[in-house]
């Protein structure tokens, strides 16, 4: 289309453009009236660049064009598009802001821990020189019960041996033994033998140093007689009631004796009808439970209601976890049991640190027992991982210890947990549960750390940070870490 200057009017140019774009052929007729001439345009066909579609091929195209061609509808659609674009832009800005705030809080928490550690090291120089010696002497006196004292004279020992033995000697007529039964699984029998002897010894130990506990009137005469024989000895004076002290003594001195191969093979539960109520219940559960897997031990642990017995079982399981087989990949139930052990040990510093060391020290073999594994191609072997809920529970426990316990400093543990979250997080997509990706934390060994963590893309890390920035529990714990520094200063 070539236009020569002065040859075509504006109306002519407009009609040519309209015809080129929309190809609406029209014919203008002039009708004369009395007052003026009137132009009437008749549209005859539609065959242009924008409306090149035939009405028969797309029957709704003409209706759709009329809808969008209306000024009100066009304004409505444009407003919706602009609004949607604004919402998307706002959400993007909020997400980026939350991610930046989360990273700043992690950095602030780490700086707070480092500053508090420097203050504690500086403050430690002001303590008197004999303070540590006094504290070590008190701890030694506290944790060394009178049972370990070997300063008795030989004459006193001989007199004690002449007294009635506190251990009852059973005859074959007193025991109900099933001679036809054979050992089905050596590890299972060893678990039962070890647990029975430990809990039996603890019940006697507890009733001896604290005779008024557990309603002694409900105990049988035989049990009370054994307790009375033990209370006669002078070496029981000053015996400590701490469960961890008893367990350490029993584990170091008696466990290997009662779990020797010969004793394990011939082990049978005795007639427990004369035992206290709690010990009767324990013997019944040991008899009914095979205790061949960690799930079965979890069932046994869950039925116990005594907090003291649960503490003993927790200490025992940590040292005897090798008796249970490992399930390499499907360990979700075991991780739930680990969370239960952590929750039950919040009030016991020693047990809590034992089980938290499984996560803090990836070389700990117990990670293969409690946590599910992720197969890592760079190292060609499974790598254990923990859930965000398990991590949150551990971090909360150490923060609580730091806030309430002034005897020890847990800043290093908290700092290490924050570093683990920052470096080892990744996304896991569960095909069975359609709830999107979840954040988990890898626990690679030191030799596998670099090849495994380098395979996590930066985009995946960024997505993890976005999810963590919306987690209220994590943000609240990071704020508590910063508040510890403020309160200490």
UniProtKB/Swiss-Prot annotation:
Keyword Membrane: yes
Disulphide bonds in the chain: none
Top-level lineage group: Eukaryota
Membrane topology: Peripheral membrane protein
Any one of the GO CC terms: mitochondrial inner membrane
Keyword annotations: Activator, Membrane, Mitochondrion, Mitochondrion inner membrane, Translation regulation
Keyword Disulfide bond on entry: no
Biological processes, Gene Ontology terms: regulation of translation
Subcellular location: Mitochondrion inner membrane
Function of the molecule: Required for the expression of the mitochondrial gene for cytochrome c oxidase subunit III (COX3).
Protein name from the UniProt record: COX3 mRNA-specific translational activator PET494
Name of encoding gene: PET494
């Amino acid at each position: 289309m070539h236009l020569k200057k002065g040859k075509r009017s504006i109306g002519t140019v407009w009609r040519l453009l309209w015809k080129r774009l929309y190809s609406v052929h029209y014919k203008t007729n002039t009708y004369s009236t009395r007052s003026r001439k009137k132009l009437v345009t008749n549209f005859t066909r539609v065959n242009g660049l924008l409306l090149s579609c035939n009405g028969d091929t797309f029957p709704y195209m003409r209706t759709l064009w009329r809808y969008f061609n209306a000024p009100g509808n066009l304004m409505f659609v444009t407003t919706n598009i602009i609004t949607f674009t604004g919402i998307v832009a706002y959400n993007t800005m909020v997400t980026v802001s939350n991610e930046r705030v989360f990273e700043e809080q992690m950095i602030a928490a780490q700086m707070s821990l480092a500053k508090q550690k420097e203050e504690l090291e500086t403050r430690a120089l002001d303590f008197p020189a004999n303070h540590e010696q006094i504290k070590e002497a008190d701890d030694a006196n506290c944790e060394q019960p009178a049972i370990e004292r070997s300063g008795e004279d030989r004459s006193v020992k001989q007199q004690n041996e002449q007294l009635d033995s506190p251990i009852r000697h059973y005859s074959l007529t007193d025991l109900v033994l099933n001679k036809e039964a054979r050992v089905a699984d050596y590890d299972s029998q060893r678990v039962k033998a070890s647990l029975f002897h430990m809990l039996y010894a603890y019940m006697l130990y507890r009733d001896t140093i604290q005779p008024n506990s557990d309603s002694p009137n409900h105990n049988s005469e035989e049990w009370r007689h054994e307790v009375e024989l033990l209370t006669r000895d002078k070496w029981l004076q000053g015996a400590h009631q701490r469960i961890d002290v008893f367990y350490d003594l029993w584990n170091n001195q008696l466990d290997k004796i009662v779990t020797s191969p010969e004793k394990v093979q011939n082990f049978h539960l005795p007639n427990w009808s004369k035992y206290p109520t709690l010990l009767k219940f324990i013997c019944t559960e040991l008899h009914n439970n095979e205790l061949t897997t960690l799930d079965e031990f979890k069932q046994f642990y869950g039925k116990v209601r005594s907090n003291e017995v649960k503490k003993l079982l927790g200490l025992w399981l940590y040292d005897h976890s090798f008796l249970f087989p490992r399930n390499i990949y499907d360990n979700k139930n075991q991780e739930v049991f680990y969370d239960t052990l952590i929750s039950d040990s919040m009030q016991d510093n020693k047990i809590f640190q034992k089980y938290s060391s499984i996560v803090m020290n990836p070389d700990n073999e117990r990670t293969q027992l409690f946590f599910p594994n992720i197969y890592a191609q760079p190292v060609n072997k499974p790598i254990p991982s923990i859930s965000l809920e398990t991590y949150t529970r551990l971090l909360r426990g150490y923060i609580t210890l730091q806030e309430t316990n002034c005897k020890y400093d847990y800043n290093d543990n908290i700092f290490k947990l924050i570093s683990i979250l920052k470096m080892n997080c990744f996304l896991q997509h569960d095909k069975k549960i359609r709830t999107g990706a979840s954040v988990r934390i890898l626990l690679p060994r030191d030799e596998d750390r670099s090849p495994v963590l380098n395979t996590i893309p930066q985009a995946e890390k960024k997505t993890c940070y976005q999810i963590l920035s919306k987690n209220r529990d994590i943000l609240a714990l990071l704020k508590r870490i910063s508040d510890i520094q403020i309160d200490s200063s």
